[in-house]
């Protein structure tokens, strides 16, 4: 069984709005904005997406130079079953729109002492065997011990942070196993401090450091929960998108439009409009005002709350 098929979002949320005749505004044609627009449009809502840039996909972009394609942001896809689920529920199978293939081997590491480590895709046993071959039995045993911790982190964080919306702080701390879960995630520990405690081989430590550095973070301060990334890659595999990762954004934008969503490019949103604490629409950079009782912001939280919403307090979930 393909391990990626084991992934299935547990939460299928239906947007709560007054009427489906109301127009929904989505800020940003990144992957999250496009996914929201697709599901909303498929459910019968009128959807308009405003994207500041000239193309869809957000950080998932590909440029072509002299016949070669280069990904300018992420280059690998993990958990493709998330997209399979989205495409299946909004029309055609993902495979009918895009070629997604496992990267094999997943990674090739070369170290200054001449050591080479080649890691397979979607194989926990194969990964341990490769580490043992290159670094020895002790390193392999330490890696497996670390991945057991990462597996627990993934089990704890997957549902509340990945598959569900994060409501209030109260809803988070009221979880039955909150204290045990906090100990597992160890938010007070950095990635490097946890890894250095579990791993003795400096090459393996360097390998794990890169899960912080490739996102522009410092492993000395990045949270230990980043260990879930190598775990997910090891278990669910690393995948290549035919034509480059930007192709994923293109086909998702097409899917959103096929479902009825309208997308306007080169059209930044300058402000989310509110009245009496309720959203009334958005103001575009060109001065246009688009009225809407429902706005989905795919911008990061700092931009959304720090600029687009002005000085309004952070939203609370109302039942």
Over which residues does each language-model region extend?
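Extreme N-terminal leader/targeting segments of oxidoreductases
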Residues: 2-24, 42-43
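N-terminal glycine-rich phosphate/pyrophosphate-binding loop and immediately adjacent elements
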Residues: 19-158
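Residues forming anionic-ligand binding surfaces in small-molecule and nucleic-acid pockets
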Residues: 222-233
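Glycine-rich loop(s) and the adjacent beta-strand/alpha-helix scaffold that form part
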Residues: 242-251, 258, 272-273, 283-319
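A conserved short coil-to-beta-strand element within the FAD-binding core of flavoproteins
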Residues: 265-278
């Amino acid at each position: 069984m393909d391990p990626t098929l084991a992934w299935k979002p547990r939460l299928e949320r239906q947007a709560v709005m007054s009427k489906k005749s109301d127009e929904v505004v989505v800020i940003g044609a990144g992957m999250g904005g496009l996914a929201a627009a697709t599901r909303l449009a498929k459910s019968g809502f009128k959807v308009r997406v405003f994207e500041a840039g000239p193309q869809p996909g957000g950080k998932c972009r590909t440029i072509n130079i002299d016949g070669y394609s280069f990904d300018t942001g992420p280059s690998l896809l993990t958990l493709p079953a998330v997209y399979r689920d989205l495409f299946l529920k909004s029309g055609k199978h993902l495979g009918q729109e895009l070629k997604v293939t496992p990267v094999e081997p997943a990674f090739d590491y070369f170290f200054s002492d001449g050591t080479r480590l080649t890691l397979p895709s979607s194989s926990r046993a194969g990964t341990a065997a490769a580490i043992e071959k290159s670094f020895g039995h002790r390193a392999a045993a330490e890696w497996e011990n670390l991945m057991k911790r990462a597996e627990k982190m993934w089990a704890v964080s997957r549902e509340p942070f990945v598959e569900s919306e994060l409501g209030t702080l109260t809803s988070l701390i009221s979880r039955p196993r909150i204290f045990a879960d906090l100990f597992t995630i160890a938010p007070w520990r950095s990635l490097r401090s946890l890894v250095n405690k579990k791993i003795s081989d400096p090459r393996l430590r360097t390998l794990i450091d890169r899960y912080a550095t490739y996102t522009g973070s410092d492993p000395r301060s990045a949270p230990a929960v980043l260990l879930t990334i190598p775990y997910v890659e090891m278990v669910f595999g690393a995948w290549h998108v035919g034509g480059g990762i930007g192709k994923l954004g293109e086909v998702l934008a097409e899917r959103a439009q096929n479902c009825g969503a309208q997308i306007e490019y080169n059209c930044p949103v300058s402000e989310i409009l509110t009245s009496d604490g309720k959203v009334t629409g958005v103001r575009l950079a060109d001065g246009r005002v688009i009225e809407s009782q429902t706005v989905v912001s795919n911008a990061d939280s700092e931009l959304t709350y720090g600029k687009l919403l002005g000085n309004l307090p952070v939203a609370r979930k109302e039942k």
